[in-house]
């Protein structure tokens, strides 16, 4: 039975058949096209969540549909016992975008990409690792050990590894924690799941200097910021003089298909050897064909520039509203956080949904926007027109929560 259930019926079926690790999702969706989605009852929404920064080209983009359809009709899955052309081509293209010699390991998600980075760190012969408070790197055990959110870790203690967590953006704390016994330091250029937190200027450059001095690897988790999300192919490229040893990718790379990558350079690129790591589905030709289509379309359609212009229009428009519930906007490109003066983000998320806009509340006082990279002016204008009413719906008109 598909395609005929109502919102209520589909939600009830979810609750009866799927594990409760996500709780009950807030909305059943059945169709998408471009920046728009439709629920099972036929209501239309503008998508400012983008599958949590996954749908770089929106929904049902012709380039991805064609690439996937063509690939599955010729070669679907062969495993890593054999060579297929799409993963080779995608790895080569990624290395071109990095502008450096290196090697790529393909997997299926950001957590898996960070697990591979964890193992690369162990293969240096050192075991100590440094990550940041508030950071999010995934929920598998190694990635969870790196994640700096105790609430997510607590049910699964003890976790693997000797990991020290330091305040995000604090270069002095980082320097104090990193020693010649430190295998790697892992940092998100922007903390997405922690509420779109941007570090101080010079932080990544300082991290590079600190790790270089101790011979530690610098791992940048670009799972959320990579693949054009911030107006650069990779966010670290906006920071002069920063060359990481490892970059982890996922989300936008597959454009909606499960695809992650761990990209390593220099000595880090040579550490994984046969038998050290692997995944049956990693480098799947269909997912890699989609990844190639994403990269080609971003370049062909000038989407890096579109991200910058759409971001500027969104940020300026939101801040110019002068709404008492808006404190400021932070982030980069089309990864933006509307910081509220009151912890009303979950209520604002629901009010936006009621108004036909899908947004996300990663923190009590932050509304996160992660729309497709091809977001148009009309969609930006529609969001800006609706936002005051959305915020008014959860306040008394003075920025304070309704009783």
UniProtKB/Swiss-Prot annotation:
Any GO MF annotation of the entry: N2-acetyl-L-ornithine:2-oxoglutarate 5-aminotransferase activity
Keyword field contains Amino-acid biosynthesis: yes
Cofactor entry: pyridoxal 5'-phosphate
Cofactor note: Binds 1 pyridoxal phosphate per subunit.
Keyword Transport among UniProt keywords: no
One biological process term in Gene Ontology: L-arginine biosynthetic process
Record Pfam families: Aminotran_3
PROSITE patterns in alphabetical order: AA_TRANSFER_CLASS_3
SUPFAM superfamilies per the UniProt record, alphabetical: PLP-dependent transferases
Its EC number(s): 2.6.1.11
Residues that, per the record, bind pyridoxal 5'-phosphate: 110-111, 136, 221-224, 280
UniProt catalytic activity: N(2)-acetyl-L-ornithine + 2-oxoglutarate = N-acetyl-L-glutamate 5-semialdehyde + L-glutamate
Annotated pathway: Amino-acid biosynthesis; L-arginine biosynthesis; N(2)-acetyl-L-ornithine from L-glutamate: step 4/4
Residues recorded with modification N6-(pyridoxal phosphate)lysine: 251
Subunit structure: Homodimer.
Family: Belongs to the class-III pyridoxal-phosphate-dependent aminotransferase family. ArgD subfamily.
NCBIfam families: argD (TIGR00707), PRK01278.1 (NF002325), PRK03244.1 (NF002874)
Protein name (record): Acetylornithine aminotransferase
């Amino acid at each position: 039975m598909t395609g005929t259930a109502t919102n209520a019926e589909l939600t009830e079926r979810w609750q009866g058949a799927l594990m409760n690790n996500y709780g009950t999702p807030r909305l059943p969706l059945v169709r998408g096209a471009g920046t728009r989605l439709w629920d099972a009852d036929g209501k239309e929404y503008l998508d400012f969540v983008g599958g949590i920064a996954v749908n770089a080209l929106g929904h049902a983009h012709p380039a991805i549909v064609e690439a996937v359809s063509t690939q599955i009709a010729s070669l679907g899955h062969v495993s890593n016992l054999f060579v297929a052309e799409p993963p080779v081509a995608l790895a080569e293209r990624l290395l071109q975008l990095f502008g450096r010699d290196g090697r790529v390991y393909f997997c299926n998600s950001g957590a898996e990409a960070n697990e591979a980075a964890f193992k690369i760190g162990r293969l240096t012969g050192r075991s100590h690792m440094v990550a940041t408070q508030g950071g999010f790197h995934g929920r598998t055990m190694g990635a969870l050990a790196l994640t700096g959110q105790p609430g997510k870790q607590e049910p699964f203690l003890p976790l693997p590894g000797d990991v020290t967590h330091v305040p995000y953006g604090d270069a002095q704390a980082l320097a104090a924690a990193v020693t010649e016994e430190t295998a790697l330091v892992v940092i998100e250029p922007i903390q997405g799941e922690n509420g779109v937190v941007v570090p101080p200027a010079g932080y990544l450059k300082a991290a590079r200097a600190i790790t270089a001095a101790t011979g530690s690897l610098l791992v940048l988790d670009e799972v959320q910021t990579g693949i054009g999300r911030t107006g650069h192919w990779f966010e670290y490229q906006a920071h002069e003089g920063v060359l990481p040893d490892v970059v982890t990718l996922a989300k936008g790379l597959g454009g909606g298909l499960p695809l992650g990558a761990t990209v390593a350079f220099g000595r880090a690129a040579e550490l994984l050897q046969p038998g050290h790591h692997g995944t049956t589905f990693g480098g799947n030709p269909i997912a890699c064909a989609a990844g190639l289509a994403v990269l080609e379309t971003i370049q062909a359609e000038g989407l890096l520039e579109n991200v910058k212009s759409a971001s500027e229009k969104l940020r300026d428009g939101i801040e110019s509203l002068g709404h008492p519930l808006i404190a400021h906007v932070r982030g980069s490109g089309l990864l933006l956080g509307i910081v509220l003066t009151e912890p009303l983000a979950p209520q604002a998320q629901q009010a936006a949904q009621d108004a036909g806009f899908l947004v996300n509340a990663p923190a009590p006082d932050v509304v996160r926007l992660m729309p497709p990279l091809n977001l148009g002016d009309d969609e930006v204008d529609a969001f800006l027109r609706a936002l005051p009413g959305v915020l008014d719906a959860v306040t008394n008109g003075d920025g304070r929560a309704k009783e």
